[in-house]
Amino acid sequence: MSQVGSAGEGSNSMAAAPPPRLLLLVVLLLVPVSNAIYCEEDDCYDLLGVKQDANVSEIKKAYYKLSLKHHPDKNPDPESRKLFVKIANAYEILKDESTRGQYDYAIAHPEEVFYNTAQYYRAYYGHKTDPRAVLIGLLLIISAFQYLNQFGRYSKAIETVKQTPAYKNRLKALEFERTGGISSKKKGHKQMDKKVEEVLSNEVELQIQGVEKPSLWRLYGVQFILLPYSIGKVLSWKFCWFWRYRIKKLPYAWEDACYLTRMSLKIPANTWENIDDYRKENLVMKRLWEKNNMERYIAEMRKESKRRR
């Protein structure tokens, strides 16, 4: 019984393996493709009438001689025109050391079909691609996805805010303020509701935190284009800062003091804008960019946090 089981396993493995004749047929079908991508069914050397070890000078002379005979300006025969196209293609392949080396390798190793094909397309189409065009295309694609992502996140945040009780209560209060507390069931009432909701939506867009409104100026593509301007602006700002506060020892302007305070507290710009003026002034007056003041402020915040517990 064990012998029967072994025979069965052997027959299954033989059935799973592809027949040798099929593999041989596939290889024989693919091998001509390796050479055909260069000069189709012809041999590039035979088209120019030179040997495979011919030097560049001999190849140029052969091409010049054949062009005098088969060039469309010299010979109007349609068949001669077709032949000249093949001759010109063969010359383009053999005059360049790189493509000629790849062609010689394809002749010597016709079984490496996929490698030879990849080498051919890399040589003929890779160098024709302008890196600047690739970079611009890549930036456009990335910027498009970036904008869609920003728009999706912002729209989702707006819809989430609209479902909150605070938004609905504010909407009712604004409607009450507009209508004077008079409820109307006329046709224009729905239009009034839409206008009120639109006004409130604009207010929500200004006050929403955590998600910024989509902007073309924040896209990577736009930032890349404006990179020289941005670098110049930063360098100019740093120079002015150094000159004003390091050399001349002037007191900090209000905007610069706000900037130092915001950087010390690690507060994003949009969050800082939403802080009321009284709290801003209170924070700026503490001069938190100075180490001792910052340590004192942190200690006060910790005490306040413990007291509230």
UniProtKB/Swiss-Prot annotation:
Lineage: superkingdom: Eukaryota
Residues exposed to the Cytoplasmic side: 152-219
Cellular localisation: Endoplasmic reticulum membrane
Domain J: 43-107
One GO term of the biological process aspect: protein folding
Topology relative to the membrane: Multi-pass membrane protein
Glycosylation sites: N55
Gene Ontology CC terms: endoplasmic reticulum membrane
Leader sequence residues: 1-36
Keyword terms, alphabetized: Chaperone, Endoplasmic reticulum, Glycoprotein, Membrane, Signal, Transmembrane, Transmembrane helix
InterPro entries xrefs: DnaJ_domain (IPR001623), DnaJ_domain_CS (IPR018253), DNAJC25-like (IPR044632), J_dom_sf (IPR036869)
Transmembrane segments: 131-151, 220-242
Positions on the Lumenal side per record topology: 37-130, 243-309
CDD domains: DnaJ
Membrane recorded as keyword: yes
PANTHER family, alphabetized: DNAJ HOMOLOG SUBFAMILY C MEMBER 25 (PTHR44176:SF1)
Role this protein plays: May play a role in protein folding in the endoplasmic reticulum.
Name recorded for this polypeptide: DnaJ protein ERDJ7
UniProt organism field: Oryza sativa subsp. japonica (Rice)
